[in-house]
Design a protein with these regions (language model features):
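Short, Lys/Arg-enriched N-terminal segments with co-localized hydrophobic residues
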Residues: 43-60
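Extended alpha-helical targeting/anchoring segments
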Residues: 61-546
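Serine residues within intrinsically disordered or low-complexity segments
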Residues: 14-17, 52
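Intrinsically disordered, low-complexity segments enriched in serine/proline and basic residues
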Residues: 6, 16-17, 26-41
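Residue-identity detector for glycine
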Residues: 9, 21-22, 42, 481
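Charged/polar low-complexity intrinsically disordered segments
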Residues: 22, 32-33, 56
Length: 546
């Protein structure tokens, strides 16, 4: 794609370089030979002429806040989000496909509040400023300075990144204006609980954590039919950084308007799905779990099974099908060099919004009815099931305890107790737990306190995780962890990593589990696992033409 400078007529041409997979930008005159080469982390370098990149943009884009407002914020904040609102004929999915042509690192976050009503904002990002990953205590940071590795708890470096980009909450902007986006795996819990030993077999080699720092955000406002283009500028050098951020916003608009879509290979399943455990093996794990319950070790544990198949192509088409088949409160697509994730999760892990914490335990499951009458019957049956109610109550108590670790004394409350939440393939019993976060705690503390959710581990949580580690003897990876964001303002919104397909190294995985209590029946719990995996497996088969 060519981006001409309106003032001097230079063009900027971008192509993938051999230098660590980066991008080479060639600045050329029209119909002239290449005269300069620059390597940078992103697709575009700032236009050569500030006049065309800044003044003309502000003239027809209305960039906010203005430079004087930014100067007033610079004393308190290291980062300020600049934004512009534009109209856009393309859909979020069409824009995402254009972003995939620019960067292998991209994401899309959206929400469906019920089966037909989509959430107000859809967030997209590309070309991260940095990436931080961790595996078995080895932290890796990749940014403009190269690759650095440390043997450490990743918490220190995550907090440092967020502190370096502390940003104000500005009126009239979407909830997310920039921050860390990605996943915390199930095994990330060992960094919050050092005494927890998770040493199960690791055949798929997923990272414990993969977060990318996005300082540019494209936010579709589905209510007002417009798009926010957001670029976070550093306040250390306001004059130059303001001009640079304005230039980035102009480039984002150009990409959305006239960028070319990536050619995305459809997924192709090259083998049948193979379960990690046969029905007989799963039932045996259920019986062993019940033995631990009878011995008084635990009240409940969530035992999972994993489906695995060989696959070529991308999960992008799978995501498009999944959002149609299984619209959910958390819909997400995430891509990096290491992994690709498509998911539709019904359940929040933890949300922090302006000082208030939320978690929403879901437990108790029935399939959706084929008719309205059958649906109503199954709903009544679920609410009358003492085993399901006991499981749910246990997890509500666990949610209260988790939030209590980081909430102000007396602020934790339970709302909407025993509500029925319906999704495309299943229904659940749900409740809301909320609290006010302590002044000395952060969004990362909230994730540390709650992950993994009781609905994916059990109660008491630590002992249940030890038993899961023993019985499954297979690292869960992303499944049961968290997917979402921590933003530069200190807020966070994360969902439980369930109802997901994740692809790595030519293989795709789908994992699901069931809560085991004293009177669980193995065959029934195995069927529950199959039901929970149904929407994702269907999306994979349909998107590949199967």
């Amino acid at each position: 794609m060519l981006v001409p400078c309106r003032e001097c007529g230079f063009y900027l041409v971008s192509f993938i370089s051999a230098n660590r997979g980066g991008t080479a930008n060639l600045i050329i005159r029209p119909r002239q030979k290449v005269i300069f080469v620059i390597f940078c982390r992103g697709l575009f370098y700032f236009p050569l002429c500030k006049r065309s990149a800044n003044a003309e943009t502000e003239e027809f884009m209305n960039i906010t806040p203005n430079i004087e407002k930014v100067k007033s914020l610079a004393a308190e904040y290291k980062t300020v989000p600049l934004s512009a609102k534009i109209k856009c004929a393309a859909s979020p999915l069409e824009v995402l496909q254009k972003l995939k042509a620019i960067s292998s690192h991209c994401y899309m976050l959206e929400s469906c509040e019920d089966r037909e009503k989509w959430g107000r904002f859809t967030f997209l990002g590309f070309d991260p400023k940095a990436e931080i990953t961790c595996k078995n205590g080895c932290v890796q940071i990749t940014d403009e300075f190269g690759v650095r590795r440390f043997n450490s708890n990743p918490r220190k470096y995550v907090l440092q990144m967020l502190a370096e980009h502390k940003s104000p909450r500005l009126d009239d902007l979407p909830a997310f204006t920039g921050g860390l986006v990605g996943y915390f795996g199930y095994d990330y819990a060992k960094y919050a609980e050092p005494k927890l030993k998770l040493d199960a077999a690791d055949d798929a080699h997923f990272k414990d954590m993969d977060l990318m720092l996005f300082d540019k955000v494209i936010a579709f406002d589905n209510l007002n039919d417009c798009v926010f283009l957001i670029c976070n500028m550093q306040t250390a050098d306001v004059e130059n950084n303001y001009a640079a951020a304005v230039s980035e916003i102009e480039i984002m608009a150009e990409v959305i308007e006239s960028g070319k879509a990536a050619k995305v290979e459809k997924p192709r399943l090259k083998s049948d799905f193979k379960p990690l455990f046969s029905p007989e093996q799963y039932c045996e794990m259920v019986e062993k779990t019940k033995h631990y319950i009878k011995e008084g070790d635990i009240f409940q544990a969530v035992i999972s099974n994993r489906l695995e198949a060989k696959m070529s192509g991308s999960l992008f088409e799978t995501y498009k099908v999944l959002r149609r088949l299984n619209p959910s409160p958390y819909m997400f697509y995430f891509s990096s060099n290491d992994i690709e994730i498509a998911g539709a999760s019904p359940e929040t892990l933890v949300k922090l919004e302006n000082g208030t914490l939320y978690t929403y335990p879901l437990a108790g499951t029935r399939p959706r009815g084929k008719t309205a009458e059958e649906d109503t019957r199954l709903e009544a049956e679920l609410l009358a099931d003492e085993k399901e109610l006991a499981e749910h109550n246990m997890l509500v108590d666990l949610g209260r305890n988790d939030l209590g670790k980081i909430s102000r004394f007396g602020s934790v409350e339970v709302e909407k107790y025993h509500s029925i939440l319906k999704f495309s393939h299943v229904m659940h019993i749900g409740s809301t737990v909320r609290g006010k976060i302590r002044h000395d705690k952060t969004a990362l503390d909230a994730i540390d306190a709650v992950l993994p959710a009781g609905t994916l581990s059990g109660a008491p949580k630590i002992r249940a995780m030890e038993i899961i580690n023993e019985l499954e003897n297979n690292r869960r990876g992303i499944y049961g962890g968290a997917i979402g964001y921590i933003d530069f303002t200190g807020n966070a919104d994360t969902c439980i990593a369930i109802r997901i397909a994740y692809k790595k190294g030519g293989r795709v995985y789908v994992r699901s589990g069931a809560g085991i209590v004293a009177d669980s029946v193995g065959e029934k719990e195995n069927r529950e696992c199959i039901n929970k995996a149904g929407a994702v497996v269907s999306a994979l088969k349909i998107s590949g033409g199967g």
